[in-house]
Amino acid sequence: MSEYKDTLNLPETGFPMRGDLAKREPEMLQRWYQEDLYGAIRQAKKGKKSFVLHDGPPYANGDIHIGHALNKILKDVIIKSKTLSGFDAPYIPGWDCHGLPIELMVEKKVGKPGQKVTAAEFREKCREYAAGQVEGQKESFKRLGILGEWDKPYRTMDFVTEANIIRALGKIADNGHLLKGFKPVHWCTDCGSALAEAEVEYKNKVSPSIDVRFKAADEAAVLAKFGLAAGHEGKGDVSIVIWTTTPWTLPANRAVCLRADLEYVLIQVEGEQPERIIVASELAKSVMDRAGIEHFHNLGFATGADLELVQFQHPFYSFTVPAILGDHVTTDSGTGVVHTAPGHGQEDFAVGQQYGLEVANPVGSNGVYLPDTELFAGQHVFKANDSVLEVLKEKGALLHHHAYEHSYPHCWRHKTPIIFRATPQWFVSMEQAGLREQALTAIKGVHWMPDWGQSRIEGMVAGRPEWCISRQRTWGVPIALFVHKETAELHPNSADLIEKVAQLVEQKGIQAWWDLDTAELLGAEDAANYEKVLDTLDVWFDSGVTHSAVVDARQEFNGAEADMYLEGSDQHRGWFQSSLISSVAMKSKAPYKEVLTHGFVVDGQGRKMSKSIGNVVAPQDVTNKLGADILRLWVASTDYTGEVAVSDEILKRSADAYRRIRNTARFFLANLNGFNPTTDIIPVEDMVALDRWAVGRALAAQQEIIQAYQDYNLHAVVQRLMNFCSIEMGSFYLDVIKDRQYTAKRGGHAQRSCQTALFFIVEALVRWMAPIMSFTADEIWNAMPAQQADGSARDKFVFTTEWFDGLFGLAEGEELNNAFWNDIQKVRGSVNKLLENARNEKLIGGSLQAELVLFADDALASKLAKLGDELRFVLLTSKAVVKPLAEKSEAAQATDIDGLFVQVNKTEAEKCDRCWHHTPDVGTIAGHTTICGRCVSNVEGEGEVRKFA
């Protein structure tokens, strides 16, 4: 053999079998940035149709977690696939930089503003802290292979962005959507500030569940409403009973609310202390049961409408409150009578406005009752629940109480219960200029993926309250408005003033607002009457208006609007919604054309990531151990529309899949050794049939892969890629061609046909891989022949190219069409089972020791005969003869194909030292005593002729 070794076309490539990604990827990254890969892509795609994926900004605090990695990788895969599809798809990553978490981190270092440091110094410290956090996260994202404008990202704290956020506020005010109101808002007593809907999370909490008596101020007036005849009025005090789980709100009670069409019953409670109580008829039994009242009877009935404006005594204060009517009253639980405190609830506030009720708010920003709060001054509201219960017992107003576990709003930062508290705030009004209806209309024009996203956001927008956009914080974009000191009306020249302030902020940042002398801007006369608003904007406003502050403003987008927003499914109540509402308020249209959502990352058992459980998978650990391409492949392999599971075992499966794809690519590259596309490509019509079939399979795969990319169905991309590499190529084509590729005449037609197919296929394969396994695709690209088929030099990077358009398929009218090769593969699969059995029974060693006789029915025999002597190369045996089924021998074995029996014989022919086939002509040719005639031709002659395989 040694004398013929140099005549073989052994595979050779510098592309290593082992990825060693953790070591190699950083080296590739360095080259990408040294050679400005992102700039090269932008240059290559200049003037093409644009695709804008607008980045939802992560918060600039802490290390990135696996959820960040999932989100950014999905975006990067989609953008790279769009680039390969011929789009100009710039990516400008962003960061959310204002707000409380950063304030809290800075407070730990320098104390609260106004104590050791001034507010101005505090803001500067916040800016420095956020900048450092951005840099840390940026490096982590770059390590994942994410390409973008990393040197020029957008940060909501950039002076120009802060200025544009103020301009957005001005536009919303201009369009009539801004509202100043004294309204109940979500309030965190730990933050000392209002919260947006998106900053509230719900968790279970145990509260006191209480039924409270409100005595009738005029018993006769109440009894008259129930139409009771004289002598049948019953005995004892008359009370209406409310149910609540927030006893601390009772000091602010200003009404009891009923439903107009609901039936209410006046119940006579019997016993030593008789009394008469009013509850909804439907709930009477459950009220009596929980109060432990066994002996009672009904005295009369009335509707809620009958009882409207009847007065009842507050349970512990000296004033009376009216019975009012509201549609929010239900019979799901409670008593059918709702305690109404307009200062502590949105529905209470709304119904209170209809009746002109006082909006009482006895609670300070720290959650403590104000000094003038009778009975409870100085107590924290949650601790005061017990005090309220004691007072109710004293006054004889407590009918029943028990501990009650229920879902309750909590601050997403502090994880502590929040309250509703009426304060003067600025709102984007959903109603006063028809914003809610406009937003609901705009939703219908957006493509939501998955489609349930549409109904989800519709429900949220339809039911949401006014958007409270003001915050009482230090580190935030100011609500740059001037209001009249007495009337609180906006300055009549607000639009011009906002633009002047925005210009100042563009030069000096938000501190310019606090440094601004009102008289300088307004003049002395106006300055005497108007004052600056000192509140800051909700950070959801900051990020929500980036469709204007960033997308409309950045020249990289060339005036294009965002095509896509892609975030986690929690953003229907967060960024998707704040962006939608602000865009409709500013531009009367949605800020996006399509919205794609992904689920949350959980562990292999479906549990949330938790440090206490110890199941956290950090992206940095994965890249340091396995490499970013494994993490990227994991992301693309999942159905990201639901929960996305990750664990060491799941990542190991991704690593295994990666190895199969890498090894397939390596086979292609190793067998292109010595191939020059400019001179060595075989014309399509002259190629061996099986080679054309393989290119056709690549074409079919490419069509499906491109479609899957277009549908953002990334796991379908991975499945098709795996199927192509493992099944169509690995299990069949590559297995069959090894003999021809290694043993055919070097540079001869048989080898060059095979190499032509391999070249075309790897040109396509490397592009399919590029959006997902970006580092490996770049590595493959650099190991490919430097020249392309047309003689031009290969681009420096695969990412600047487009899908390969040089593939071709078999025509269905051809004799050896796709259906033919499908049948051949089935035969091969059946034969392989018999060969495996023969090996197990020690009849043969390898398959080349076998000679086959295939007894086939006429239809199948005719197909097999088309391959002639080349059938043996497809079946990987030294001989394969086709005979009619009628001649079937006793030794022939049945297969799982109807009409096919196969006899496996051990060959008696000599083994060729070069190709290892056993043929009768081994050693029969002078000068070549150990090789077969085919090999002699490949070594010294014209080379063997292959037509089919």
From Swiss-Prot:
Binding site for ATP: 611
EC number annotated for this UniProt entry: 6.1.1.5
Cofactor-binding details, from the entry: Binds 1 zinc ion per subunit.
Binding site residues for Zn(2+): 912, 915, 932, 935
Motif stretch ('KMSKS' region): 608-612
GO cellular component: cytosol
Cleavable signal peptide: none
The keyword Transit peptide appears for this protein: no
Reactions catalysed, as given in the entry: tRNA(Ile) + L-isoleucine + ATP = L-isoleucyl-tRNA(Ile) + AMP + diphosphate
Motif 'HIGH' region location, chain numbering: 58-68
Location in the cell: Cytoplasm
InterPro entries per record: aa-tRNA-synth_I_CS, aa-tRNA-synth_Ia, Anticodon_Ile_BEm, Ile-tRNA-ligase, Ile-tRNA-ligase_type1, Ile-tRNA_ligase, M/V/L/I-tRNA-synth_anticd-bd, Rossmann-like_a/b/a_fold
Binding site for L-isoleucyl-5'-AMP: 567
Function noted in UniProt: Catalyzes the attachment of isoleucine to tRNA(Ile). As IleRS can inadvertently accommodate and process structurally similar amino acids such as valine, to avoid such errors it has two additional distinct tRNA(Ile)-dependent editing activities. One activity is designated as 'pretransfer' editing and involves the hydrolysis of activated Val-AMP. The other activity is designated 'posttransfer' editing and involves deacylation of mischarged Val-tRNA(Ile).
Family statement: Belongs to the class-I aminoacyl-tRNA synthetase family. IleS type 1 subfamily.
Name this protein carries in UniProt: Isoleucine--tRNA ligase
Source organism of the structure: Vibrio cholerae serotype O1 (strain ATCC 39541 / Classical Ogawa 395 / O395)
Gene responsible for this protein: ileS
